Design a protein with these regions (language model features):
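Short intrinsically disordered terminal tails
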Residues: 1-3, 68-75
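Short, charge/polar-rich alpha-helical segments
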Residues: 1-19
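A generic signature of intrinsically disordered, low-complexity regions enriched in glycine/proline
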Residues: 6, 15, 38, 44, ...
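Residue-level detector of functional hotspots within protein domains
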Residues: 7, 28, 55
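Short E/K-rich amphipathic alpha-helical oligomerization segments
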Residues: 15-47
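Amphipathic alpha-helical coiled-coil segments
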Residues: 21-23, 47-71
Length: 75
């Protein structure tokens, strides 16, 4: 698979991960403002948000690595 194809695929995954992370954060913040939310529910929501955010960051890091490879290939 060429570099451009890999980058397009990762960009698509990044957008999906970003959307999921934003939704998970919104869910967590909504629960945090809900007086009837249980501590367990808050913790689960926070962990889900953090997991998705970490995935987003990992994808961004991989995109950076591939872009560096592309620059090295050009030079």
């Amino acid at each position: 698979m060429d570099i451009e194809t890999q980058l397009r695929m990762l960009e698509s995954r990044y957008r999906a991960a970003l959307s999921a992370a934003v939704a998970a954060k919104a869910h967590y913040l909504a629960l945090a403002g809900e007086p009837s939310a249980t501590p367990n529910a808050l913790e689960r929501a926070k962990l889900a948000w953090q997991k998705l955010d970490a995935r987003k960051r990992a994808i961004a890091a991989r995109m950076g690595e591939i872009e560096e490879l592309e620059q090295d290939a050009i030079v």
